Amino acid sequence: MSLDTNKAYFINQRDVVLRMQPLEKTSKNAANHLLLGDYLRYLGTTDGDWAKVKCRGDEGWLKTDWFSEQRLLEINFIDIGQGDGCHIVTPDDEVILIDAGEGEGFTGQGGDNMYRFITWRYNLRCRDDGKPPFDIEHAVMTHPDLDHYYGFINLFKHPKLNFKTISHNGIVERPLGGASQSSFLYDLGRKVPPTPRQKVYHLWDTVRTHQDMIEVLDAHPNSQKFYLSTLRAARDNNPQVQFKFVDQSQKFFAAYNQNNDLQMEVLGPITEDIEFNGQTKDCLIKLGNEGETKNGHSVIFKLRYGKLKVLLGGDLNAKSQDYIAQYYSGIQTKMSDLEDEIRDIREDLISQNLTIDERKAMEQRLDEHRKLLDLIISKTRGVFQADIAKACHHGASDVLDSFLQAINPIATVISSGDEESHSHPRPDALGAFGKASRGHRPLIFSTELARSSVEFSYPIKFYQKLKDMEAKKDAATTQAKKDEIQQDMEQLRDSNVAKYGMITIRTDGERVIIAQKLEEERSPGQKWDIYDLFWNDKLQEYEYRKGKGH
């Protein structure tokens, strides 16, 4: 391979050790531990089949057949504190952010971890002011819950970032004003009253187009609602940004369609054509209260790259899972009703004194319910089955076991937060995820659990380092030196977000690794805990095989 200092290169091995010297040995020669897909720069020097490179901030040596020009798919689940946050880099080097956590939150005291991660990842603090802003192709706000969208507000305001499109589920909270007494009005917009046949409300004011969004923002220029404030920040600081409504009728997200190596199917939210007052609109059903409706209509993506399938599904709840399964299976019986009836029949069979005929009839009814539930699961699985899935609603317990069975993943990633009142991930949900997964040893990752084991040891070192830097700053004799140390402190805080809690997926469409940082690195060449998914040709699906050290 002819190397060029102006080209981008990427690790093509599962993992490799960056050497300090061009030698095979790693003992006392390890500079860093690199993963499949890590970006590197060639520094212009070779020594036999070794090349000097810079990767993950360190200079060192790698064999030239350990890297290539092929960029992989990278999916990072960020430890953003409370909420969800996913960072994707496509094989075409486009950046997609799906949710960003709660950022600074209601109090303004939150960690704003997605902001810090993006600042660290793209070195924004050191980016030349004369350079054009760094492009983020897509920001996706899966639904208007603070712990999913408010982390975007400071990113939207960042002068060194440019957001091209912002996608959403069409639900925009707005002030009620003087219309709050009318049942026809709702702070998610107007709702269509049910007809005798429908028996359900639909949201009439779903924001469907860019112009719809601009009109809503213009109608409420001074609203203090956090969602509107976040959207205004996007518009005011990114003049060319386009707001895009996402629903299942589009089939694919943006240009990631069947003509692209990376495909992103849109499975939700689901709209229905509703006629009201002589107009017909594609509307979202009112699933329950406002929270259930907002969460249940989360944007759902199914990513396909090569052989790998990844499901990303916002904050789906039991009511929405029933509705989704009805839509995709074509069977109107609810999963939740069947689950309840099966449980009740089983209890009756155990606890009641039944005649032979009564028992036979009850067992027959149980068999019929099980067969129908299995059919719904099978039909839904045809659409939703994935190899890796982001858990719905941070590992909350408001999920259907049967819907989890329809997803049937090998690995589940739970993005969970710090608020003890939520207690996410819930123990019963963890058990349900494992039980509904495929394989003998299904994998469950949690951004919080990945961090919690080091939160009492690592921070002591981290804060001591900050304290030492603060002392140096106080002792500095010039403002320039003080500013330099302050920037170093901010960069340290930014990089800390990526060190612990993040779960990363790397794949070329055939090989797949899922990795997280070790609690305590064993050496500079052993920093990552890595899990491999292997393609089984006979089964035509991925499987996990336990490796060394697991």
Provide a role label for each language-model segment:
Residues 2-7, 32-48, 52-58, 66-72, ...:
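Flexible, acidic/histidine-containing loops and adjacent segments that form or flank the divalent-metal
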Residues 84, 104-105, 144-150, 172-176, ...:
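Active-site environment of divalent metal-dependent phosphoester hydrolases
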Residues 376-380, 386-458:
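Internal alpha/beta domain cores that form substrate/cofactor-binding pockets in large enzymes
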Residues 18-21, 84-88, 97-98, 104-108, ...:
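Short, solvent-exposed loop/turn elements at domain surfaces
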Residues 91-96, 105-168, 377-396, 408-413:
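Active-site metal-binding motif and surrounding structural segment of the metallo-beta-lactamase
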Residues 20-36:
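SH3/SH3-like (including bacterial SH3b) beta-barrel domains
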Residues 70-94, 100-102:
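An acidic-aromatic substrate-binding cleft motif
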